[in-house]
Amino acid sequence: MSQFLADLRAKNPLVHCITNYVAMNISANVVLAAGASPAMIHTPEETADFAKIVGALTVNIGTLSPSWVKGMKLAAEAANEAAVPWVFDPVAHFATPYRAQAAQELLALNPTILRGNASEIMGLGGQASEAKGVDATDPVEAAEAGAMMLAKKYGSVVVITGETDFVTDGSRVARVSGGSEIMPMITALGCSLTCLMGGFAAIAPPMEAAATALALFAEAGVQAEKQATGPGSFQPHFLDALHNTTPETLEKAGRITWQ
């Protein structure tokens, strides 16, 4: 799996990140630090054209408007037509009817990778959840059956992020451990993971791309925590750790368990 990190840095794929206002800066910096190249384009007048020429597309519904939803759908449709992999992050899709409808319309376009927290994945799978905002209130284990179902239904690799991340294509399963308790204290850090996952999806098969992105993220979190004194100092140390983690270090960390 560590070879994919070397490939990412050698190929420096262009990642089309349609993400929310809160996440744009940190997402672009995370993608750059890891070794890929971000483009933060969301207007519907150009999303379809751009999605056809990139290595991967990522779509995050954190901040929505009719224009943004149109741009997201056009980009996803264009990516499918051009065989460009795309990652969907259905942020708090259960919060409002408008958000829920947008999420279902995008999910129907069969994302290559679907990434969410346990509450988001449970909701998309039709399971009851206690979540009320963007943060998960359900354990990863509660969403695993729903993730398997969604993977089979939409032909997607489904990722549940949490204390131990869960990845499935409907038959295979991988779990990724690591990270830091400080990570949830930094706004939009999870959103940036979606963009990073797009970088790996541009150069690796979807299941392996998702697992490698999670492993790099987790390892960087572990390393950043060793030097940080709180959320403020954690963020720059995290970016440095993404940049400085080598394929050999990632391999030695052994953060991925395949089942």
Put a short name on every predicted segment.
Residues 1-88:
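Conserved N-terminal subdomain of the carbohydrate kinase-like
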Residues 1-8, 156-178, 249-251:
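Acidic-glycine-rich active-site phosphate/pyrophosphate-binding loop
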Residues 68-117:
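Glycine/small-residue-rich loop that forms an oxyanion/phosphate-binding "nest" at active or ligand-binding sites
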Residues 98-173:
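Conserved phosphate/ATP/ADP-binding segment of small-molecule kinases
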Residues 123, 185-216:
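Short, small-residue alpha-helix embedded
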Residues 146-151, 206-221, 238-239:
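Short, well-structured alpha-helical segments that form the helix of a local strand-helix-strand
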Residues 176-187:
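Short pre-catalytic strand/loop immediately N-terminal to key active-site residues, enriched for Gly-Thr
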Residues 219-259:
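Charged C-terminal helix
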